[in-house]
Amino acid sequence: MVDGPDEEFEDVPEQVRVRREKRDRILAAGGEAYPVSVPRTDSLADLRERYAHLEAGEETTDQVGVTGRVVFLRGTGKLAFATLQEGDGTRLQVMVSRDGVGEDALAAWKSDVDLGDIVFVHGNVISSRRGELSVLADSWRMASKSLRPLPVLHKELSEETRVRQRYVDLIVREAARTNVRARSNVVRALRRTLEDRGFLEVETPMLQTLHGGASARPFVTRSNAFDTELYLRIAPELFLKRCVVGGIERVFEINRNFRNEGADSTHSPEFAMLETYQAWGDYDSIGELTRALVQNAATEAFGTQLVTLADGSEYDLGGEWTSISMYPSLSASLGEEITPETPREHLIGIAERLGISVDTVRWTHGKLVEELWEHRIADSLHSPTFVRDFPVETSPLVRGHRELPGVVEKWDLYVRGFELATGYSELVDPVVQRERFVEQARLADLGDDEAMRIDEDFLRAQEHGMPPTGGMGMGIDRLLMALTGLGIRETITFPLVKPR
């Protein structure tokens, strides 16, 4: 049956109109433009490997059935040439001749096949006179008629086109395919490193009745079934800690988080996160684990810990990594000592002199210290660096430092000037945790939409007893940024983009 005319057909671009007419012509002649299947016998990559030994002009009697997207077409008289490309980018030439397929099939090839079509070709494996491995066709079929033309293959796609039409990007750009493979290899390496150390992977809720586990603005939705407001999770932390309470002493999750905040070269509202917790650990042991995770991921995905970035420079992730402390490093940068006892008003004055916009009502001492530190130091941390010992006010889920009053056992890992991961010695005292939650609730009541609410069920879990624990969260997209030098939208296969 031939489809009826499209009511909007008059408005489509000319090339789409022509291709649609070819599709209709194939169907009207009793052919198939989109068959259920075709008898493919080999991938193009398999053929290239198996017949790499053929000399120029050598022919075989081996018959194969191959498929691929047409990325080059040339036809002269009784012979037509095409280059097919399969999903991984492997290409192979096919030759369609009148002697091989017959006059009608050759004419149909010339009239119906366009760049971008996916075709099936059956024939003998040969090497052309120029030494090009080829399939000399004895038959062909359309496997999927493309109604839209491909972009010009030798021209660079704009970033806008790449992120909005990743499917086109994957067809035409080897770098896009490489990025997807690298991401898969990195995630596999993270899982293997953790599983080899006895960690168990779990899944925790994406929809939550309270938002917690990080300081961020949540996405809000509503459940019709429960007639209640729900939040897309900003972090899985509080549920993974429940697992530790329940006896899963080494636990991790790789999944999506959502934060209703800005989007730029290092931030995406939807992003992938690895979060892991280890009972009987602390922020030192979890830091060692984090270094192993990153280094193993580099080796798995790129074969080396000295990775080559998109701009051609090299970045060394090997060996031991530097550690600095927040208060001493900020003091050295400012030329005056900053401690947990430094008055908030003094910090406000420093920030204003440096041109930092300050919320004088809601920003605590800790928030001011972190903002000053980021303004003065963060961008300068090119080599992998653990920044340790944060203000207590900004880290409500972290254990107080065992020696230093006013700070907590937390580090942020900076790589190439941006934050890659965060690690804690976890707060396991439910009484202190409740006090921290109460302070967060006070900030929320003052209008801080990133502050956490009191999670009574989590506190109930902690009241059953939670062992000393180290925890870490690391952005998968940012890890790819660190390993490749790309922006975050290039490391996410289908990033969120503003609707047109």
UniProtKB/Swiss-Prot annotation:
Cofactor(s) this protein cannot do without: Mg(2+)
Textual note on the cofactor: Binds 3 Mg(2+) ions per subunit.
Binding, Mg(2+) 2: 419
Gene3D superfamilies: Bira Bifunctional Protein, Domain 2, Nucleic acid-binding proteins
PANTHER family membership: LYSINE--TRNA LIGASE, CHLOROPLASTIC_MITOCHONDRIAL (PTHR42918:SF15), LYSYL-TRNA SYNTHETASE (PTHR42918)
Record-stated family: Belongs to the class-II aminoacyl-tRNA synthetase family.
Subunit structure: Homodimer.
The protein's name in its UniProt record: Lysine--tRNA ligase
Organism: Kineococcus radiotolerans (strain ATCC BAA-149 / DSM 14245 / SRS30216)
